[in-house]
Amino acid sequence: MSFNIKEISEMIEKQIRNYNKEVVQTEQGTVVSVGDGIALIYGLDNAIMGELLLFSNNVYGMVLNLEEGAVGSVILGDETLIREGDIVKRTNKVVETPVGDALLGRVIDALGQPIDNLGPIDFTKTRPVERVATSVMARKSVSQPLETGILAIDSAIPIGKGQRELIIGDRQTGKTAIAIDAIINQKNRNVKCIYVAIGQKDSTIVQVVEKFKKYGAMDYTVVVNAGASQPASLQYLSPYTGITIAEEWMESGNDVLIVYDDLTKHAVSYREMSLLLRRPPGREAYPGDVFYLHSRLLERAARVNENYGGGSITALPIIETQAGDISAYIPTNVISITDGQIFLSSELFNQGVRPAVDIGPSVSRVGSAAQIKSIKQVSGTLKLELAQYYELESFAKFGSDLDETTKATLDQGAKIIQMLIQKQFNPLEQVDQAILLLTIKSHLLKWLPLDSIYNFKHEILSHFKNDQQAAKLRKKLDEQKTFDDQLQKEILKQAQKVVLKITKNIKEYKPEAFGNITEYQNLGK
């Protein structure tokens, strides 16, 4: 076989002449070590913080550590598919989540993927999960009430749209119940809701979703679930996914309520990742930036002015305490970030007071500006009366020699507590709350025995809905949202009828001992 050197040289020359220089640049690195949801990668010198990385087998990771010569990444998927020596590619993108109305009624994971077996989500837009909080000049002061339907909260610890109100208490004190009630009460109020479950049992989430479906709340709610079976990276990411979905609605002019259940587990998942990434531990082994972890999340909840959409995000973060210790690291951090807290007491819970709101240490720093006038008129002395009751109650245990004023204060306080007891999934309209609070303020309860207070509450609400004259007064109060002297007197006359009806049916009970109810002078004052 002979070779024609001339033909070969011409062929090579032709190929050289037709050669087009195209450089396709892809940055890739190699997995040095992997374990516990963390991968150490060599060779990605230009990776940026929070960037999405693509491992082999289509598993994604997120950059959280930038070290000299290596990159620390958390794995957002099944780490068992990753081996040492695997190739890792940069995507030049950060983590994004789908947003928009297509998410309503769905249960999604921290990456925005549906996990409710209802098929894919038909979304048209995504947003990066990390974003700088709304600027000061874009914000608007809180002035509209967010109605929870819970008498103890709406009267003494009111929440406004755009506020961050912490729900804090020991385990099994009804923290989630308050948040669920608040979401259920938003039905027909044009408020979209997001429930973020962090580190919860899957069985618990199923129960919550079933409750939402039962009361029609899933029509305006999206559930973001990063359960206890999910890796720490997804538990860490889930609240940011939730607030990103909320921001899209806020900028479209909608009011949004978001619940984080709970941020204690969120901090624990971040601590786990930080320790595995070899970051220096601080107090309680949390990393130094654990305050920033929650502040950058909660500062994204706001009420914005019309130039930025005119919507609002109201946040209800939940924190679980150990033995009522609100001075621990994470509770104090979140208390200092939020605009107030609802403190739930295990002692009250065990006494049968549900919701177990301890009104003493509970406070709402900005919500009072959002309270409607009718409730503000009749709830002003509520906290003071309860504070006096709790103070006197502790002294009353030591002796039975009490003067009449002290006895009256103790009696009124005990009856107020009974009035504030409310069953779950039974939210109250604001007009009904105003009527109940008026009966408390006017000391009408002194004609009733303690064990008939709960019945009185049910009867008076029923009376103002079913009695023709009382229903007209209720409607008038609902429309004008304030008490004038005449309306107040007429409502209390109707309330007197209910008191007389109840006391008449109690054997051997003499309400005359407290004076003539029809001639009582404090009514209406």
From Swiss-Prot:
<dbReference type="InterPro" id="IPR000793">
    <property type="entry name" value="ATP_synth_asu_C"/>
</dbReference>
<feature type="binding site">
    <location>
        <begin position="169"/>
        <end position="176"/>
    </location>
    <ligand>
        <name>ATP</name>
    </ligand>
</feature>
<dbReference type="GO" id="GO:0005886">
    <property type="term" value="C:plasma membrane"/>
</dbReference>
<dbReference type="GO" id="GO:0046933">
    <property type="term" value="F:proton-transporting ATP synthase activity, rotational mechanism"/>
</dbReference>
<dbReference type="GO" id="GO:0005524">
    <property type="term" value="F:ATP binding"/>
</dbReference>
<comment type="subunit">
    <text>F-type ATPases have 2 components, CF(1) - the catalytic core - and CF(0) - the membrane proton channel. CF(1) has five subunits: alpha(3), beta(3), gamma(1), delta(1), epsilon(1). CF(0) has three main subunits: a(1), b(2) and c(9-12). The alpha and beta chains form an alternating ring which encloses part of the gamma chain. CF(1) is attached to CF(0) by a central stalk formed by the gamma and epsilon chains, while a peripheral stalk is formed by the delta and b chains.</text>
</comment>
<keyword id="KW-0067">ATP-binding</keyword>
<dbReference type="Pfam" id="PF00006">
    <property type="entry name" value="ATP-synt_ab"/>
</dbReference>
<comment type="function">
    <text>Produces ATP from ADP in the presence of a proton gradient across the membrane. The alpha chain is a regulatory subunit.</text>
</comment>
<comment type="similarity">
    <text>Belongs to the ATPase alpha/beta chains family.</text>
</comment>
<dbReference type="InterPro" id="IPR036121">
    <property type="entry name" value="ATPase_F1/V1/A1_a/bsu_N_sf"/>
</dbReference>
<keyword id="KW-0813">Transport</keyword>
<dbReference type="InterPro" id="IPR027417">
    <property type="entry name" value="P-loop_NTPase"/>
</dbReference>
<dbReference type="InterPro" id="IPR023366">
    <property type="entry name" value="ATP_synth_asu-like_sf"/>
</dbReference>
<keyword id="KW-1278">Translocase</keyword>
<dbReference type="InterPro" id="IPR020003">
    <property type="entry name" value="ATPase_a/bsu_AS"/>
</dbReference>
<keyword id="KW-0375">Hydrogen ion transport</keyword>
<protein>
    <recommendedName>
        <fullName>ATP synthase subunit alpha</fullName>
        <ecNumber>7.1.2.2</ecNumber>
    </recommendedName>
</protein>
<dbReference type="GO" id="GO:0045259">
    <property type="term" value="C:proton-transporting ATP synthase complex"/>
</dbReference>
<dbReference type="InterPro" id="IPR000194">
    <property type="entry name" value="ATPase_F1/V1/A1_a/bsu_nucl-bd"/>
</dbReference>
<dbReference type="GO" id="GO:0043531">
    <property type="term" value="F:ADP binding"/>
</dbReference>
<dbReference type="InterPro" id="IPR005294">
    <property type="entry name" value="ATP_synth_F1_asu"/>
</dbReference>
<dbReference type="Pfam" id="PF02874">
    <property type="entry name" value="ATP-synt_ab_N"/>
</dbReference>
<keyword id="KW-0547">Nucleotide-binding</keyword>
<dbReference type="InterPro" id="IPR004100">
    <property type="entry name" value="ATPase_F1/V1/A1_a/bsu_N"/>
</dbReference>
<keyword id="KW-0066">ATP synthesis</keyword>
<dbReference type="Pfam" id="PF00306">
    <property type="entry name" value="ATP-synt_ab_C"/>
</dbReference>
<keyword id="KW-1003">Cell membrane</keyword>
<keyword id="KW-0406">Ion transport</keyword>
<keyword id="KW-0472">Membrane</keyword>
<dbReference type="InterPro" id="IPR033732">
    <property type="entry name" value="ATP_synth_F1_a_nt-bd_dom"/>
</dbReference>
<feature type="site" description="Required for activity">
    <location>
        <position position="362"/>
    </location>
</feature>
<keyword id="KW-0139">CF(1)</keyword>
<dbReference type="InterPro" id="IPR038376">
    <property type="entry name" value="ATP_synth_asu_C_sf"/>
</dbReference>
